[in-house]
Amino acid sequence: VHSKKHMTRTTRAGLGGRLLSLGAGLCLAGGPLWAAQSEDGDTRLATVVVEGAARSEAQKAEARLKKVPGAAVVVDNKAVEKGRATNAEDVFALQPGIFAQATSGSGANKISIRGSGLNTFYQGYALGIRYLFDGLPITGPGGTQEDYLSMNGIDHTEVLYGANAFDYAATSLGGAINFVTHSGYTAPGNYLRLEAGSFGYRKQQLSTGGVVDDSDYYVSIFHNERDGYQHDTPNKGQELVANLGHRFNERLDTRLIVRYREETLTQGNTLTREQIKHDSNSNKVPTGRKKDGSTWVGSTTTYRFDDDSRLQVGLSVNDYPLLNGWRYSATPQDWRSTDTNLTLRYLRSQDRLFGLPSDTTLTFSSTRSQFADVKSHSRATGQLLQHTDYTGSRDTVFAFGNELQLDPRLWLVSGLSAINIDRDVSIEYSASANTSEFPSAVSYNKWYAAPRIGLRYQLTPDIQLFGNASRSIDPPVTWQLGSTGVPYIRPLTPQKADTLEVGIRGSVGVVDGSLTLYRSWVKDELLSVVVRQATATADALVANSNASPTIHQGIEAGLGIQLWEGANGDRLDLRQAWTLNDFHYRGDSTFGDNELPSLPRQVYQAQLNYQRHDGYYAELNARAASSYYVDYANSLGAPSYTLWGAKLGYQAPGRRWEVFLDLRNLTNEHYATAANTAYDAKGRDSANFYPGDPFNVTAGVAVRF
């Protein structure tokens, strides 16, 4: 993306000048194991019986991700459900390095990890991150459908930053997010949850789960509605989640997961800074999208050859229609897509390589668009305006990974991914003639390599150092090459990045934390710009292109402190997260070293939580975001903001029932939650900002029976 004139970039915060002191650690109580000596003098180990609660699936995932030589976190939904639990903004709060904000308070979310999908627009798809359900991808050649990011029926969520998502065949700059569905083991019994709040928000959930002999089941239904803060922005959805598992014997088990969701959503138009301040619920040009039934069916089967090796076979089908612009748009579009995926994983642990302990993983994942196209029509006449076809496009990854234990404290992690990108995009019909220099069809099949190497060092039993070097490959999704806005296909090349990452994580006493620094040298970054804003008579026009070389670098820091613990078990805890984003051009011929727009330079989050031993809890939280540019010329910035919130609640023993009150934006701040990206705003206040919700309250109650 290039501008027409150069503007001097404002000074960025240097990485070297930003440090966050992190203590680490939780005191673990333990006792000695004494050797018993028999009467004849033989020394034998005494039998020790350890009793305690079994680890949850989220805790098991957290222990597994500690072996990753880079940033990776697990979000347990039990913690999320102590307040409003409706979208990605709720789930990823207090996670450094992750930007997740709802646009206009709706289910459309801007989600970015380390600047991935930097200026994605919000019309049904998410970019820059590989999303999965239970290890099977929902991201395909056309991107990821936002309606699948409802966060319903989830036990926990794994977030692996950048190349640390290697084992999930993720090769994107942002890494991967894996949503793990509840099963009959994690959510037994019957469960009813009701939420209601400001701006007509309502959500209902009813689920049942259990274990019968060698089988387990979980079935849940959801319904959500919201009238909206901006005028005329209602949205509603209903969803079914089912998870059925069966264990045939000690070697073989299988699981079938089904997700079905219907959704209608009306999005408010973006506003100027002046409107954000004085008329933030204005909505002159609403847009709407409708999903009349997205269906994802996935199956995973695991065969254990022995205690140390196993094969996982995954199959999935993803059918996702999208009626974009079904309300108000002058040229509504009908998107129809069906993807299939095959995933194979072979895992070998407790092996030997060069005489050293070794774990090896082989992964194959291929997602193909069996059918994919978009048709646009004139609302006034019903005439077909354009038909663009994407059928046959495919993303395939072969990955080999190994973890080699060099000594009792040091592990070498290496890997290589071979990536095959197949794009087949053609305009089958257009009412407008193609008079541009670009073709009406693009078809290519290319291979890329993405190596990875890292080290993990156990400094103490509770403190870990890590570092890695990697390459990421982000192919353009099909519709970025061309959809219905123009009668030509714009050839785009995959985005490539080389990344260095170092960090520390662990715990000491009552303190735990993590600190990660990274720098990515990006080539051909895929960037978007809103060329024309939507009006009452014309739809928005968004252009995509490969940029000149850019830099993505930053600091991600998290810190947790137990401030106080009473004799009866009452606790006071403070959690903090700080993110520094520094994304900019590298000597662009027009932009120089200008900042890349769309994400805050700094984000600070904090949560002070008081938990009583009898189940009552109270929380005070804060989120502060700095200003950032919304155009490549760096002439117009989003205002900074600070939001305060609070939670009150009670959980009965065993969580048999619970109730909460979630208060947000206590000071009624008028702010922009996210922004579109302009080419050159020329310093003029323009409509690029999504308004955040003012003061709002959500109440909820849940019962297990």
Could you say what each language-model-derived stretch is?
Residues 57, 89-136:
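Extracytoplasmic beta-strand/coil segments of soluble accessory domains associated
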Residues 121-122, 129, 134-161:
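Short acidic/polar hinge/loop motifs at secondary-structure boundaries
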Residues 189-191, 196-225, 230-267, 288-310, ...:
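Transmembrane beta-barrel wall of Gram-negative outer-membrane proteins
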Residues 304, 310-324, 368, 458, ...:
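Membrane-embedded beta-barrel scaffold of Gram-negative outer-membrane proteins
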Residues 412, 420-421, 519-521, 543-631, ...:
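Gram-negative outer-membrane beta-barrel transporters
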Residues 473, 523, 627-629, 650-705:
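C-terminal beta-signal and adjacent terminal beta-strands/loops
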